[in-house]
Regions:
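Short, flexible hinge/linker loops that cap or flank conserved catalytic cores
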Residues: 106-108
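Short helix-loop-beta junction
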Residues: 127-141
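Short coil/turn segments
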Residues: 117-122
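Conserved beta-strand elements of the Class I
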Residues: 111-113
């Protein structure tokens, strides 16, 4: 009940309103998150894959948009940090469930290195970008969060990626 109310009352911050052709899927997914139903949330994302929704659309239009809305709800104090972290954790699990599907296409012999430098702990954006590049044939080196700059430079020097992304 509380989850449904939170979703129904969702009003984007001015300038961030985004209409989506996947509004129904976003609402279903966020409902699972706010009900703290991990199993159902993961199954729902699998259902979207089985329905033939493109992985790019699942990542960008459904998962990213859901997380943007969750972040906005946290920012406006409509949800607490523990709920925001739970939603992030479940979304990371959902993404991991799709990981093997990212390698179905032809490879491009290109490499992306993605990292969150310094004290940046929020790695989901970098993970999404990295997975999208994998889905389009790139190999990836994902270093994760809070990596000191010297180690980033070492990784670039050792691996010679075609593209480096910082988040």
């Amino acid at each position: 009940e509380e989850a449904q109310q939170c979703i129904r009352e969702y009003k984007p911050v001015d300038g961030l309103k985004k209409e989506s052709k996947y509004e129904k899927e976003i609402e279903e997914y966020m409902d699972c998150l706010f009900q703290k139903n991990t199993k159902k949330a993961i199954a729902l994302i699998r259902k979207y894959v089985d329905r033939g929704i493109d992985l790019d659309d699942i990542y960008v239009e459904i998962l990213s948009e859901s997380m943007r809305r969750v972040g906005e709800l946290w920012h406006t104090a409509e949800i607490t940090v523990d709920t925001e972290h739970y939603c992030t954790s479940v979304t990371q699990m959902a993404m991991a469930q799709m990981y093997d599907l990212l390698f179905d296409g032809a490879r491009k012999n290109k490499t992306i290195l993605s990292v969150c430098p310094g004290m940046e702990l929020h790695e989901m954006g970098a993970r999404i970008v990295t997975d999208l590049f994998e889905n389009h044939g790139w190999d990836s080196i994902f270093l994760g969060a809070a990596v000191p700059v010297d180690y980033i430079l070492d990784a670039v020097s050792e691996n010679h990626p075609d593209l480096v992304t910082l988040s």
